[in-house]
Amino acid sequence: MKQEFTRIAVKVGSNVLARRDGTLDVTRMSALVDQIAELNKSGVEIILISSGAVASGRSEIHPQKKLDSVDQRQLFSAVGQAKLINRYYELFREHGIAVGQVLTTKENFSTRRHYLNQKNCMTVMLENGVIPIVNENDTISVSELMFTDNDELSGLIASMMDAQALIILSNIDGIYNGSPSDPASAVIREIEHGKDLSNYIQATKSSFGRGGMLTKTNIARKVADEGITVIIANGKRDNILVDLLQQPDDTVCTRFIPSTEAVSSVKKWIAHSEGFAKGEIHINECATDILSSEKAASILPVGITHIEGEFEKDDIVRIMDFLGNQVGVGKANCDSAQAREAMGKHGKKPVVHYDYLYIE
């Protein structure tokens, strides 16, 4: 059955766009652009999250002296991003499609204001027939605030832009029930909510990127929980994007079945804000049980056992259960001093209101 998506996010990994020697595979890039153009002309809005800047720059410049990993990455990215976006511009122009470059950093998602500003920018681009091409701005990203890889960025973009599907293109067909190199292994075609995949995932990283299948799976789960279909497929297969939408039953991939529960725009932002958390709120067993139920509940002071770190009102905080496991993230309704003052008391205002609480 044909997939009727009207807006999708497509993430293309470094291993799809780079040859074995690290140079840009222009032939593969051109083929992907042809497919995106075909889908775009059929009425599908597409946001492209593209790796490949570092791989592209690696083939363009040879440092005069040995550089540390950060300097080398920034150099290759600065040179390679210009080459990458220029190539995309030329390829899409052949189809009469305009593209716009969106370079972002993790810090740009840390506040609701910056988050909405980015969303508005890309919304205007889509409304005017422009395909946003998104990548992390490696030249100014600091190591401790870099995305794990573009899988993490693509999940955030898909969520922010209310995409109906996120397609992650890698160099394998999906998630296998064994080692991908084992002929007896098969691709897991569908993954339902809550299915345990820990026995199947190998925490290995790609040759040119920073991510691996473990990262992809974690991102896919979070995005699917927000009601977005997530597909992991092989970007080196001919016509893969068109086939995924027009012949999904006959196309090998791993599909994460989305949750049917609606998630608000604010909670989507909070769900991806864990990396900006300023503190931790630890709750007792009773509060933990309430949060794990179907009941809509806020974090009340009476259920808090202790607070770690210092935070201000509206900062992101982690919610930890009575065993010390993270169960969610939320936006603080007061600062840490006020939270400590109210801790354990009845009749006090929520420290984290339900409307600004995301339970994992």
From Swiss-Prot:
One of its GO terms (cellular component) is cytosol. It comes from Bacteroides thetaiotaomicron (strain ATCC 29148 / DSM 2079 / JCM 5827 / CCUG 10774 / NCTC 10582 / VPI-5482 / E50). This is Glutamate 5-kinase. One of its GO terms (biological process) is L-proline biosynthetic process. Its main location: cytoplasm. It catalyses: L-glutamate + ATP = L-glutamyl 5-phosphate + ADP. Residues 278-356 form the PUA domain. Transmembrane segments: none annotated. The gene is proB. ATP binds at K11. One of its GO terms (molecular function) is RNA binding. Its EC number is 2.7.2.11.
